[in-house]
Amino acid sequence: VYDPVTVDKPETDYGGKREKDNNDENPWQLVEDALKLVEDQVTEDDIQSFCSDGKTIDCVYIVYAGLGQNDGGNGTTVWANCSTTGGKTLRGKEVRWYTMSGELSPEIKDEHGTTIKPEGVNGLGVICHEFSHSLGLPDMYPTAKSAYLNNQEMEYWDLMDGGEYTH
């Protein structure tokens, strides 16, 4: 775990400029910018412990400020995600995977407008979900409306479905 860094670009450069669009435009640039900023904090001993083969870092995890688009942020924010880095490096070592998620979870209100849970620090659910992708686990939530037939999905019982949002 390293000290927070502040990137020079606005969030829209990474999440997107189209507020009603759920597609991130450039999360890889956030990874590259964050790696450059944290590089001075990373020691040679750290690099050795990160590199199981001596050449590559398997995965880095980035927690970005604010809400993620997946958790109440608007369309210009970054959606929590996991992907390959496309050859990004940290202190001369290639980083294979990145995972990222937002720092905050949203306020939740009931049907009467009463706050059930105030906005606060995000729980481990989304972190565990996204990191599990870097280990090879797939999403278990339905990706087609027809898959919601008779409420048969795993929902909150599975970390790779809605369980990531149980706080």
Listing of model-derived features with the role each one plays in the protein:
Residues 1-153, 157, 161-166:
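Active-site-proximal segment of zinc-dependent metalloprotease catalytic domains
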